[in-house]
């Protein structure tokens, strides 16, 4: 039995997908917030595809995010990231996990607003620091003091992340509990009160 079919919230999930129409659920937030892991579970719950924007960028470029940063720099990466997200937004409904800097682009935010519903997975510095220590593929954290870099990025980004349609705290609880909160929050959004989505 599928997770969608077996979960108590399955009927609401079906109604939510109907309300989404062609819109995507776009997860935004810092590296380490859980966008990919929670996104996969959310997509399974809703029975729609999960897409990781970073993976799609790597596929399009034929190199890893680290390699793109090293060879071309962050501005080049951000331009490619914006193009890939615009393309992906045309193929909803889906759950789309975006890179930490993607939502900082006003053009990308406008595209997400037009073609999706944004969900900020908000996490504390402590949680992010603990989670990102496990990963070596974070180009923005390659300096001598990743904790200070995380703090600076939080200070720079959180006011913009707060413009998302929905905010859910990412914390050390079972992922299904966070998925439950996302589903409940999406169901309550006025933007999803009427079915259809972007034409």
Each language-model region and where it sits:
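A glycine- and Lys/Arg-enriched "phosphate-lid" helix/loop adjacent to the NTP-binding pocket
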Residues: 114-159
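Hydrophobic anchor at the beta1->P-loop junction of P-loop NTPases
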Residues: 27
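Walker A (P-loop) phosphate-binding loop of P-loop NTPases
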Residues: 32
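Hydrophobic positions on the alpha1 helix immediately C-terminal to the Walker A/P-loop
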Residues: 38
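ATP-dependent small-molecule kinase phosphotransfer cores
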Residues: 49-113, 137-138, 160
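Conserved lysine of the Walker
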Residues: 35
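NTP-dependent small-molecule kinase module
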Residues: 1-20, 41, 45, 91, ...
């Amino acid at each position: 039995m599928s997770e969608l079919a077996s979960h108590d919230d399955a009927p609401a999930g079906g109604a939510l997908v109907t309300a989404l129409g062609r819109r995507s659920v776009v997860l935004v937030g810092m590296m380490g917030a859980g966008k990919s892991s929670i996104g996969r579970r959310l997509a399974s719950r809703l029975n729609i595809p999960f897409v990781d924007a970073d993976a799609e960028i790597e596929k399009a470029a034929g190199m890893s995010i680290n390699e793109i940063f090293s060879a071309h720099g962050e501005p080049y990466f951000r331009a490619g990231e914006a193009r890939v997200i615009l393309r992906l937004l045309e193929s909803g409904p889906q759950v789309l996990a975006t890179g930490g800097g993607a939502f900082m682009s006003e053009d990308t935010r406008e595209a997400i607003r037009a073609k999706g519903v944004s969900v900020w997975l908000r996490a504390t510095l402590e949680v992010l620091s603990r989670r990102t220590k496990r990963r070596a593929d974070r180009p923005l954290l390659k300096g001598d003091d990743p904790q200070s870099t995380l703090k600076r990025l939080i200070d720079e980004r959180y006011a913009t992340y707060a413009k998302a349609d929905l905010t859910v705290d990412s914390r050390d609880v079972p992922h299904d509990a966070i998925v439950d909160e996302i589903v409940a929050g999406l169901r309550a959004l006025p933007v999803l009160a009427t079915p259809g989505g972007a034409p």
